[in-house]
Amino acid sequence: MTIRGILFDVDDTLVDYSATARAGILAHLGAEGLLDRFASPEHAVALWKELEEREYPRYLAGELTFSGQQELRSELLLAHIGASTDDPRAWFDRYVALRDTTWAAFPDAEPLLSALTGRIAVGVVSNSSRSHQVGKLRTVGLLPHFGEAVLCSAEFGTPKPHPEIFLAGCDLLGLPPEQVAYVGDRWDVDGLGARDAGLRAYWLNRAANGTARQDGVTVIGSLTALSAL
């Protein structure tokens, strides 16, 4: 079946979220006078990432709100160094203000999207809020490629890997799932989720060399691999 549309994840697929989060938390802890209370800057970064990977899935499972998991991560990070805050929302927002000055798209994102223009429909399906991801895509210059075709779990009500959100993304493009590819950086949430929803699934593993096929998912090391679709 010919692929007529591609849906994209955003964080660590189109946008280098990991590098941005690293720079943001280091700048934030420095500004708060807390960085030297961690064993090392890298320890602070690793702990912040660990907390996100532990608490964010609880949001996806419906145990926490999107804002709630952010506030909890703030409280847990501070508790690790024996600190606290009366307003975890404001503490996280100060982190966001610093983090969001450093957003950058991966070098292969813009060339691919430009190459697809007029040939393949594109859209976004993301486990986040629409305002957040639209702002991010606008900052890095990629939003014009997507227009209104940005679907996020906070508004839709169901996150990846549930098939409903992938199928809603296909509807957004006006295409059946068998004519749509999905690419994201997480094997389970993106690769297996898209596969199980009936889309052609691509797992973006930037550490991979070349292209491979695994459990019905195509593994690619760069977005450039999609230019041949």
Task: Show where each model-derived region lies.
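Glycine-centered short loops/turns at secondary-structure junctions
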Residues: R119-I120, G198
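N-terminal helical cap/lid subdomain that shapes the substrate entry/recognition surface
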Residues: T2-P107
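Catalytic-core regions built around general acid/base machinery
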Residues: D108-R119
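Asp-based, Mg2+/Mn2+-dependent phosphohydrolase catalytic module
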Residues: M1-I6, S18-A19, S114, V125-L229
